[in-house]
A protein has these predicted regions:
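Loop/turn positions that initiate beta-strands
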Residues: 36, 80-83
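Intrinsically disordered, low-complexity linker/loop segments enriched in Gly/Pro
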Residues: 92-203
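A short, solvent-exposed, low-complexity linear motif enriched for acidic/polar residues
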Residues: 2, 8-11, 18, 24, ...
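Short, conserved secondary-structure segments in the cores of folded domains
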Residues: 29, 71-76
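A generic structural signal for residues embedded in beta-strands
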Residues: 41, 85-88
């Protein structure tokens, strides 16, 4: 079975042959698969391995937010053409043992509710996640791999970039293209590639 395996001791920037952290139509596929072929993909966490067990919120001061939300791939499906509908079945998902939740003032979906700084570490075992920072609570394991999507077309990139820039101009929040810590790091992908954090029409 074809696969993309992750060395969890290395950041994406140090292992760029396994993924990307920008959306762009010119990012080269890492592997090719035939329709119906199974593939094994390992994924990094949303921080690209920067949040480690035992860290405190204060340790996140040097956290590189622009390198976050790395994706594994791309995977090219042989015969697929722009505009095709792809059906992808996720046969099995396996969770890592460590997870985390962070709340930063002024950030995230609940920024208007929570104004405290907080970092919880989760241990996933026996079908539940438990955190010493939130004693007495266990959450049923609900494995979520993050984002899956298809490469945007050049036209989609331009439209989405304009839409998000307009949102920022009107006082909203969006992560605009930024070459800092982009993977792949070469141009024009680095400076024009869309950040992988927000959901869009491609995935």
């Amino acid at each position: 079975m074809k696969s993309i395996l992750i060395d969890r001791n290395r950041r994406l920037r140090d292992d760029p042959g396994t993924g990307h952290n920008r959306w762009h139509p010119d990012i080269e596929p890492i592997i090719e698969v035939a329709p119906g072929e199974d593939v094994l993909l390992e994924t990094r966490d949303a921080s690209d391995g920067q949040v480690k067990p035992g860290m405190r919120f204060e340790d996140l001061a040097g956290h590189d937010k622009k390198a976050g939300h790395p994706l594994t791939g791309p995977v090219f499906v042989k015969g697929a053409q722009p505009g095709d509908v792809l059906e992808v079945e996720f046969v099995e998902l396996t969770a890592q043992r460590h997870g985390w939740t962070v709340i930063r003032p002024g950030a995230g979906f609940l920024r208007d509710i929570f104004d405290a700084r907080f970092l919880a570490h989760w241990e996933v075992d026996g079908g539940f996640a438990r955190s010493v920072q939130i004693p007495g609570v266990r959450i049923p394991e609900g494995i979520f791999m993050g984002t899956a999507g298809v490469a945007p077309s050049p036209e989609q990139m331009l439209a989405w970039s304009a839409r998000e820039a307009d949102l920022v101009r009107r006082g909203g929040i969006a992560l605009l293209p930024d070459a800092q810590d982009a993977v792949p790091p070469h141009e024009p992908i680095a400076s024009t590639g869309l950040r992988t954090m927000p959901p869009r029409e491609n995935g």
